[in-house]
UniProtKB/Swiss-Prot annotation:
<keyword id="KW-0521">NADP</keyword>
<comment type="similarity">
    <text>Belongs to the chorismate synthase family.</text>
</comment>
<dbReference type="InterPro" id="IPR020541">
    <property type="entry name" value="Chorismate_synthase_CS"/>
</dbReference>
<feature type="binding site">
    <location>
        <position position="48"/>
    </location>
    <ligand>
        <name>NADP(+)</name>
    </ligand>
</feature>
<keyword id="KW-0285">Flavoprotein</keyword>
<dbReference type="GO" id="GO:0010181">
    <property type="term" value="F:FMN binding"/>
</dbReference>
<feature type="binding site">
    <location>
        <position position="278"/>
    </location>
    <ligand>
        <name>FMN</name>
    </ligand>
</feature>
<comment type="pathway">
    <text>Metabolic intermediate biosynthesis; chorismate biosynthesis; chorismate from D-erythrose 4-phosphate and phosphoenolpyruvate: step 7/7.</text>
</comment>
<dbReference type="GO" id="GO:0008652">
    <property type="term" value="P:amino acid biosynthetic process"/>
</dbReference>
<dbReference type="Pfam" id="PF01264">
    <property type="entry name" value="Chorismate_synt"/>
</dbReference>
<keyword id="KW-0274">FAD</keyword>
<feature type="binding site">
    <location>
        <begin position="125"/>
        <end position="127"/>
    </location>
    <ligand>
        <name>FMN</name>
    </ligand>
</feature>
<dbReference type="InterPro" id="IPR035904">
    <property type="entry name" value="Chorismate_synth_AroC_sf"/>
</dbReference>
<dbReference type="GO" id="GO:0009073">
    <property type="term" value="P:aromatic amino acid family biosynthetic process"/>
</dbReference>
<dbReference type="GO" id="GO:0009423">
    <property type="term" value="P:chorismate biosynthetic process"/>
</dbReference>
<comment type="function">
    <text>This reaction introduces a second double bond into the aromatic ring system.</text>
</comment>
<keyword id="KW-0028">Amino-acid biosynthesis</keyword>
Amino acid sequence: MAGNTIGQLFRVTTFGESHGLALGCIVDGVPPGIPLTEADLQHDLDRRRPGTSRYTTQRREPDQVKILSGVFEGVTTGTSIGLLIENTDQRSQDYSAIKDVFRPGHADYTYEQKYGLRDYRGGGRSSARETAMRVAAGAIAKKYLAEKFGIEIRGCLTQMGDIPLEIKDWSQVEQNPFFCPDPDKIDALDELMRALKKEGDSIGAKVTVVASGVPAGLGEPVFDRLDADIAHALMSINAVKGVEIGDGFDVVALRGSQNRDEITKDGFQSNHAGGILGGISSGQKIIAHMALKPTSSITVPGRTINRFGEEVEMITKGRHDPCVGIRAVPIAEAMLAIVLMDHLLRQRAQNADVKTDIPRW
């Protein structure tokens, strides 16, 4: 299982399972001399952690991160940073009934086909519990980007089911349990979630993440284009089934005269490209969207098979999110931060001396 690392110069490797003793990660490539404490990481972990509202799973994990290495006297040393979060609220007995049954829509079937066995407790390595370490590592990247380059990364929920959410007020995102930027839609979201809970069903969502202050020039054509790496990072998040950069699939209905981001002496006049042209950042806001499927961990009966090939009826027990998109917001922010920090370090390594007279806005 070699796919546990992301990044080239800023590298994040995670380990751990949903019901194991702990989750952890190794973060390589952090420059020395950056002030860093566990409190710097805890804020985003608290935004992601389970059991914080009635709309998410009631598994209660404090997600208290420990810095094991790479920090001395409050600053980074330039060596590998080891991070650890202990699992404290596992209820593995909830999953004993699915030991030999493949939950439809989950990774049970594919993991067993690949490895010949699987950790059925909460999905094991395939669980979104793993993303806690991505958020911890991403918090390091967010701190570096903000303090060294003035880059701000923000995410929000922009659709739940058939309810579109307009980005009206970023300040509202942290004031409600949905990460919703549209205060007029909070009641509708609450009503939908109550209905889903009553029905024992789930719903999909769309999350948008925006990076402001990104300098022009990030991205490594042709295979490590910035948008390609962002798409790769976001698609690696559990339940994500689609990623768009800028206008994404909406460009299909546009003409070239509409879609091109014209430039005047005052700067770009639009941002259909989402801040990336030719795989390289343009200096505009980087905008990405991701679509998350509705979780299959529901109490609505469904058909599946067991490992003996027998058809059985499946009802998933345990503690699950009726809409996984809610807690995906800080995860999306973290993954975008990881990619941007990696590309900033790569740009600095190759092109630190490049100077141009081309205007920047």
